[in-house]
A protein has these predicted regions:
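Conserved N-terminal phosphate-binding loop of PLP-dependent enzymes in the Aspartate aminotransferase
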Residues: 1-142
């Protein structure tokens, strides 16, 4: 009963504060702020559902050849974001925006700027990797 009451109170707040309407405007702003990323030579797709946006990086845009997972290109974007004070979510070579509902249009613009910079950095050079770079329990048999 207590959890249900809390859920109903949350729904009341969403209705009173017009959270869904505000999110529609913010998601539209997010789409506009990130639209230029679709033109990046290493971005296959920018996709969005509501307040969740994903940017998929690839080696070759025409063939949509993915980066090897071992290169962890998304992690490079994430690390750049942290250095700039932004939290982006990497999953392989896909970088996600998962902002809180209280984000402002200016903060969305900042996320788009940081993501663009991070993608430039992550896709600039070839990456040399070893399995031991990614798994702490990896033991070199040699």
């Amino acid at each position: 009963p207590l959890a249900c009451a809390a859920a109903l109170a949350t729904l009341d707040i969403f209705e009173e504060d017009k959270v869904i309407e505000a999110n529609r405007a913010l998601s539209t702003h997010m789409a506009r702020a990130t639209a230029h990323l679709a033109d990046h030579p290493h971005v296959a797709e920018v996709r969005q559902t509501g307040m969740v946006l994903a940017i998929e990086m690839v080696q070759d845009k025409a063939s949509r050849t993915p980066y090897p997972w071992q290169e962890r290109r998304g992690l490079k974007v994430f690390q750049h974001g942290l250095e700039r004070g932004a939290l982006l979510r990497p999953l392989g070579s896909v970088v996600y925006f998962l902002p809180p509902y209280v984000i402002t249009p200016e903060q969305i613009d900042f996320l788009a700027e940081v993501a663009s910079e991070g993608i430039d950095i992550a896709t600039r050079d070839a990456v040399s990797v070893a399995v031991s770079d990614f798994h702490p329990d990896h033991r070199d048999p040699g």
